[in-house]
């Protein structure tokens, strides 16, 4: 999917500029673009809008659980399911630093929602009982989950073990010990 190919983070000042940047990235053969919740609004909503103006590029959401505490992982999983359906299965979900046990717990809850359609946890960070996710994502098992290491952060091996892919900067070598894990190199902006 993203093995040693280029992706881009989009930090555009307007929705029109964001759409133009995504269209240009797709035309240039870039594998993926990523948006973050910020001044333009919610990243999932923005990416869903970008899916209407693009057709092949993967559309990634970057989320930071420490700065978005209102977004419970079961809510995020449902939002990502809807986005995956709207985008035709072109969605990605990337978790950004700081990393903690809460991120692993969030990934486990998202995956349960996507794979079983229901999630329950008595974990310390996100206790929940009977959260339901219907319909299921277009992509079996749900969107791929990335760990964003583009700032040079070292991730816990347990976190790397639950990720589908890693986002690393083109400025730095790939971390050691990642056999079998997909890498998506991101050009710094």
Region spans (language model):
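Active-site-adjacent structural elements that line small-molecule/cofactor binding pockets in enzymes
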Residues: 1-189
């Amino acid at each position: 999917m993203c093995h040693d190919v280029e992706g881009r983070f989009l930090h555009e000042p307007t929705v029109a500029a964001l759409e133009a940047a995504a269209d240009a990235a797709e035309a240039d053969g870039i594998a993926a673009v990523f948006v973050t919740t910020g001044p333009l609004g919610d990243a999932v909503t923005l990416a869903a809008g970008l899916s209407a103006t693009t057709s092949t590029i993967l559309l990634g959401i970057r989320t930071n659980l420490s700065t978005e505490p209102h977004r419970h992982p079961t809510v995020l999983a449902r939002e990502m399911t809807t986005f995956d359906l709207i985008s035709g299965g072109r969605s990605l979900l990337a978790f950004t630093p700081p990393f903690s046990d809460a991120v692993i717990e969030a990934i486990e809850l998202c995956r349960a929602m996507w794979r079983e359609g229901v999630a329950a946890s008595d974990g310390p960070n996100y206790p929940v009982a009977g959260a339901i996710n219907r319909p299921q994502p277009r992509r079996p098992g749900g969107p791929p989950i990335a760990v964003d290491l583009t700032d040079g952060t070292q991730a816990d091996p347990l976190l790397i073990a639950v990720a589908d892919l890693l986002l690393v900067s083109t400025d730095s070598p790939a971390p050691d010990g990642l056999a079998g894990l997909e890498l998506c190199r991101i050009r710094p902006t």
